[in-house]
């Protein structure tokens, strides 16, 4: 029978493997080819990766706004209000959650994590809103 420690260790290993699957995450969130190419060309250079993430965040934010407007155009007044409330709450959560990742004591890696969190959350929400228009 495994001890709590062994189970915890196994959980950490599985979690670590899940974190190291950016191509799957990128495909799931519908990242652009420009982003994937940019990240590949960055060769792990933090400044270049930051530029790639910033550019893709702008593209994903535009996609999110487009999907939000499209969904709003299909909703009744009551449902529009519900979506506005939900979207405002989501923005607050995303900002607070991703700010937590940007630990000022964590160096450039933590800042990159915070920016990537923001990008992933925005892309996921854009996809979610797109799926709701169907």
Residue ranges of predicted features:
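N-terminal secretory signal peptides that target proteins for export/translocation
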Residues: 1-4
